[in-house]
Amino acid sequence: MWGHLAVMWHTRFLLAVDGLSSTAYAGARAVMERVFREYGLPTVIRSDNGGPFVTKAVAGLSRLNVWWTQLGIGHDRIAPSRPDQNGSHERMHRTLKAETVWPPAANAEAQQERFDGFRSEFDFERPHQAIGMKTPGSLYVRSAREMPARLQEPVYPGHCVIYQVRRNGMLHFKNRTLFLSELLIGQRIGLEEIADGVWSIYFYNLLLARLDERTGKLSA
């Protein structure tokens, strides 16, 4: 069983601890949809580079951060093999495992009860040195950004050239056919010329890549 955790960075408030059978997209999204509806949308989410957060697609896109981008949520990835960049989260995760997972509960329902109990105590009973020996629940403030009923279409500046990604994840641009990502099939992207023949490719406000139209090559 995988534990899916969501934590407010500044207050240490633990938004969710859910036991999932895998790191697959569907389970992670279901947890996040619930969290976003209850607590509002964050401005940015920090994560490691594992599934379901990062893939080998352009800009490391995954189904999850495509959805975040559509919601106007930024994605801050720590550097590969640098868990110290997410130190407080890693420490909390170790504490969670020590107190709830070893030994494991008899079944998934019992394990979730342990997770729920840990979250309640962590948020409302335990003082934390990093926040002045206060509890996370005493400092937490709900986000004012609400989960939208439907996703908004991207709006690009007027000087951008707009294209729709084709069914096979390809982009046809100036007599060149370039592969972007199957994760973007049907999505509208914006191209902004930043130098002679050099273009920035955007998905909403996310920079996907730079394109040199002379060579047809994409770069980070």
Residue ranges of model-derived segments:
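RNase H-like DDE/DDD metal-dependent nuclease/strand-transfer catalytic core used by mobile genetic elements
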Residues: 1-3, 9-121, 210-211, 215
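Hydrophobic alpha-helical segments, especially N-terminal targeting/anchoring helices
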Residues: 7-8, 193
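C-terminal, beta-rich DNA-binding module of retroviral/retroelements integrases
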Residues: 123-220
